[in-house]
């Protein structure tokens, strides 16, 4: 007589499993096919990003920050310069603010496309991955035309503005992309949203209540998919988002399907913001020269008027004034924050990163208890984590 084993099994998922989206390890306790418990093990991609910041000037540190969330590197640059600008009281020219918003919203679209493709591949739909990468290539080409780099290390944001202005013909290419992309999002929806297999894999799976989401400190699409109307672009009024007409994507269900819907709507809204920003792009300087010219007096080169090659010159180091500040932006994954402490030195005394992925990942064990193993893949994919920012 063959006996059926009834004791629980401990299963290691990752850190090299393709569905883990990075070096995440999950210790999963199984009772047959049902998940009893789950313990995330993180830290495999820890690179000491906070300590590196405390030993670098802001200009030296900017090339590093793209490696936090390497799927959407511009947000890391934005929060890095915003933290210093707030502490030092540096203003940003209107044109520079518009350029920043254009880049950030294009980055949001690339992030959601990079989430959409692998998420559906995890669920068994391979073709949408190729579609998502096709559209994403357009944006990476736009990034390359401005910054010289495609995915990460754009190194575009500067304290007081941006590194370079847009090249000739870029705005037309950007508007062409927006006109091309909006119908493509509708195509994705027709292809995927009402697919019966897709619906059964996501509807009611990994649901979390509005109050639980707030208690866990969730942010971004994870929070808005629970019916909480909270978007830092509307709440904090940073950059020039108030100049544009757009809506916050909110869905009340709190499950994996709601998170998918939020991100799809966000891609549409980001596209609308980019269109409005490009059409209303103001003239003027693309950076606050005072932020670069912190050295006063005749030694300074910045007052000689040859601003044509300003981005080619090494930026003047300036001392971060005494004080502390917490600055946050609405990244593609949620609230990305920096707590900075300055002590009148060229390097910050303390640089604390508040990554959205790290906080959102903590809710995973609660979401997958009692679910099947196949559901775990869908739930983890719906959270949208990048291990670079989780481990820092």
Curated annotation (Swiss-Prot):
Under the heading InterPro entries, the entry gives:
NADH_Q_OxRdtase_suD, NADH_UbQ_OxRdtase_49kDa_CS, NDH1_su_D/H, NiFe-Hase_large
Q: Could you tell me the keywords of this UniProt record?
A: Membrane, NAD, NADP, Plastoquinone, Quinone, Thylakoid, Translocase, Transport
Query: Disulphide bridges in this chain?
Result: none
Q: Kindly indicate whether the keyword Cell wall biogenesis/degradation belongs to this entry.
A: no
* Annotated Gene Ontology cellular component terms: plasma membrane-derived thylakoid membrane
**Source domain of life:** Bacteria
Task: Name the Enzyme Commission number(s) assigned to this protein.
Answer: 7.1.1.-
GO biological process entries? photosynthesis, light reaction
* PROSITE patterns (UniProt xref): COMPLEX1_49K
Q: How does it sit in the membrane?
A: Peripheral membrane protein
Indicate the family of this protein.
Answer: Belongs to the complex I 49 kDa subunit family.
Enumerate the HAMAP family for this protein. Answer: NDH1_NuoD (MF_01358)
**Protein name per UniProt:** NAD(P)H-quinone oxidoreductase subunit H
């Amino acid at each position: 007589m063959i006996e059926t084993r009834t004791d629980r099994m401990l299963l290691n998922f990752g850190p090299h499993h393709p569905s883990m989206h990075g070096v995440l390890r999950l210790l999963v306790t199984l009772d047959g096919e049902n998940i009893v418990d789950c313990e995330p093990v993180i830290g495999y991609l820890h690179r000491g990003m906070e300590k590196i910041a405390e030993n670098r000037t802001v200009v030296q540190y900017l090339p590093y920050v793209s490696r936090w969330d390497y799927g959407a590197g511009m947000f890391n640059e934005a929060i890095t310069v915003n933290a210093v600008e707030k502490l030092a009281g540096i203003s940003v020219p209107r044109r520079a603010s518009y350029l920043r918003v254009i880049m950030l919203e294009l980055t949001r679209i690339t992030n959601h496309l990079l989430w959409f493709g692998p998420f559906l591949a995890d669920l068994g739909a391979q073709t949408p991955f190729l579609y998502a990468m096709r559209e994403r290539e357009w944006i990476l080409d736009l990034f390359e035309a401005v910054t010289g780099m495609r995915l990460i290390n754009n190194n575009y944001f500067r304290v007081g503005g941006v590194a370079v202005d847009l090249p000739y013909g870029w705005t037309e290419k950007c508007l062409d992309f927006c006109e091309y992309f909006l119908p493509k999002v509708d195509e994705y929806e027709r292809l995927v949203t009402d697919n019966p297999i897709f619906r059964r894999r996501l509807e009611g799976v990994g649901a979390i209540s509005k109050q639980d989401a707030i208690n866990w400190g969730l942010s971004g699409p994870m929070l808005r998919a629970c019916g909480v109307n909270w978007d830092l672009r509307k709440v904090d009024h940073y950059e020039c988002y108030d100049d544009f007409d757009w809506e916050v994507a909110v869905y009340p269900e709190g499950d994996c399907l709601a998170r998918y819907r939020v991100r799809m709507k966000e891609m549409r809204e980001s596209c609308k913001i980019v269109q409005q920003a490009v059409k209303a792009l103001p003239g003027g300087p693309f950076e606050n020269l005072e932020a670069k010219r912190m050295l006063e007096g005749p030694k300074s080169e910045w007052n000689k008027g040859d601003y044509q090659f300003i981005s080619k010159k090494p930026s003047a180091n300036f001392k971060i004034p005494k004080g502390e500040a917490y600055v946050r932006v609405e990244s593609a994954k949620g609230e990305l924050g920096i707590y900075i402490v300055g002590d009148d030195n060229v390097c910050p005394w303390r640089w604390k990163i508040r990554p959205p992925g790290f906080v959102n990942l903590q809710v995973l064990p609660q979401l997958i208890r009692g679910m099947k193993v196949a559901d775990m893949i869908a739930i983890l994919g719906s959270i949208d984590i990048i291990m670079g920012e989780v481990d820092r």
